[in-house]
């Protein structure tokens, strides 16, 4: 679709069958046709090292360019030790460098956190938001999305098994679409 909004989806868990990946697929499935959500892998990004800025690895360059081309970013993250996974923090660092050339700058974004537990990865959600604000990414404030019991509300194919969670996420994605339009003008 020529008029679609290009959304880079960043799944913070590297496991192929992660609950975060399932949730990201489910979110994409309930988004309007105007949102084209592309899950961009982060597992192949070498750890950020400033010494590499003068001759960056090809995966860094490809990742940065993909983020730059996007209209918006959707982050879906679990919680590791009350924060975001290291792979996500590394992807954020890779995309933000070299200094003054951040691929993230000005990109509207939304954060969804999830866990099998009841708190829905609250700590990861807020640590991630703190980084995104610093990177000048307008983060959608409402609705907030903390999906607890995620293992019970999404199936292995990335579909919702709980109708109320599906409806909440449909509304979340609709709000995200409006947020993108608001920020991008």
PLM segments and residue spans:
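Cofactor-binding loop segments of dinucleotide-utilizing enzymes, especially the Rossmann-like FAD-
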Residues: 12, 42, 114-115
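N-terminal beta1-alpha1 ligand-phosphate binding loop
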Residues: 2-34
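Short beta-strand elements in bilobed, periplasmic/extracellular small-molecule ligand-binding domains
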Residues: 34-47, 139-148
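Helix-loop-strand module that forms the ligand-binding subsite of alpha/beta enzymes
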Residues: 56-136
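Glycine-rich phosphate/pyrophosphate-binding loop and the adjoining helix
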Residues: 2-4, 8, 138-185
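N-terminal beta-loop-helix "entrance" segment that forms/cooperates
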Residues: 42-59, 154
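Secondary-structure boundary/capping motif
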Residues: 16-19, 48, 83-84, 120-121
